Amino acid sequence: RHKGDEHARLVDFEMNSICAAGTGSFLDQQARRIGVSIENEFGEMSLQSVNPPRIAGRCSVFAKSDMIHLQQIATPLHDIVAGLCFALARNFRSNIARSKEIKTPILFSGGVAANSGMVRAFKETLHVDDKEFIISPYHASMGAIGAIYYTKNNHLIKNPFSGTEMLEKHLLSDINYFVTLLNL
C-alpha cells in the first residue's frame, strides 16, 4: 500500500517456468494416482499430518519417485499428501520468490487456493498468518477477470467486451453468495 492510498498495488509477479511440479495439475495427477479426490479429500487429509516427510519439489519426476518410496515404506497417506503440499510451497519460495523479500499481504489466487493443505503449507513456509495471506472468494476466476481487463484496456478485440461494468458491480457488491452465476 502507498501512504494515503486505500488500495493495495501489485508490486511483483512471477510464475513457475521450470517444471510442472509447481502446478495445480501436478497436484491433480498425484491425487488421482493415490486414489484421493483433490476436491474433497486431499487438502483436509493433509491437515491431519503432524510431521510431513520431505519430498522433492523442484522436479515432478523426483517428487513422484519420493512419494512412491514413501508409500512402499508404509508412510501414512496423510503425511505423504502434506509432504507434497510443503514441497510445492518450498518450490515456490526457492524458485519463484528466490531471494526477493516477500511483502505482505500476499494474495493466493488460482484453483489451488481452494486446497486447505496448500494454504497451510504456504502459511507455514512463508511464516505468515491469516491477516497476511489473502484468499479471495473469486480466487479461481481471477486470471479470467484479469484477462478481460487486459483485453479491454489494450483494445485487443474489435468488438469490445461490455460486461466489465457489470463485473465490477458484482465483485464490489456486499452480497455474499456461496456459488454465484455471473451473467455478462
Feature map (PLM): residue ranges:
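Acidic, glycine/GT-rich loop-and beta-edge segments that sit at the periphery of enzyme/chaperone cores
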Residues: 150-184
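Adenine-nucleotide phosphate-binding core of ATP-dependent small-molecule kinases
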Residues: 65-94
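Short, surface-exposed connector motifs at secondary-structure boundaries
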Residues: 10, 76, 99-105, 128-132
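Conserved ATP-utilizing enzyme core subdomain
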Residues: 21, 38-71
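Glycine-rich phosphate-binding loops at beta-strand->alpha-helix junctions
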Residues: 98-125, 136-143
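Gly/Thr-rich phosphate-binding beta-strand-loop-beta motif of the actin/hexokinase/Hsp70
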Residues: 1-6
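Glycine-rich phosphate-binding loop plus the immediately following alpha-helix
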Residues: 9-47, 140, 149-153
